[in-house]
């Protein structure tokens, strides 16, 4: 639908928020359809850095509990009624918070080997945890093929 509107001269800004694999997908499609514009798309995707839960995105619930994002309600880093948000947010002595700030070093499997890690940021860690009970396991909702995630490396598998 977005492409159809764009082709009709009615460009729309589209925000996808629950699967950061959409970024590489859109870039790869743009590379085929409009290589010049694909460069701009890639720069924007790199600037955004994909999922930013625990870094650029956070959630303060109604009771003051601080979470990595709105989906991490089962894990609190502290309460703004007891400590300032800035203190809670920058406290990397809490293991999960520290790792979320530098999650590229902790993701496993195909996420760790993915050439798009700088673009998607490892996708949703909370979804990986919900399915595998491991925050750092690959996000099960990543629909990119092994070939697509290895394109920048010139390989064909990310096992």
Walk through the language-model features, giving the residues of each.
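Short C-terminal domain-edge/linker segments immediately following a structured domain
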Residues: 47, 88-91, 99-100, 142-147, ...
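Cysteine-cluster motifs in flexible loop/terminal segments that predominantly coordinate metals
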Residues: 105-154, 158
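Conserved short histidine dyad/triad with adjacent acidic residue
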Residues: 41-45
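Short, acidic, Ser/Thr-enriched surface-loop or helix-capping motifs
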Residues: 60-61
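A structural motif corresponding to the C-terminal lobe/cap of the Radical SAM core domain
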Residues: 1-13, 34-36, 46-50, 133-151
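C-terminal accessory region of radical SAM enzymes
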Residues: 1-40, 65-122
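Short, small/polar residue-rich loop motifs at catalytic or cofactor-binding pockets
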Residues: 51-55
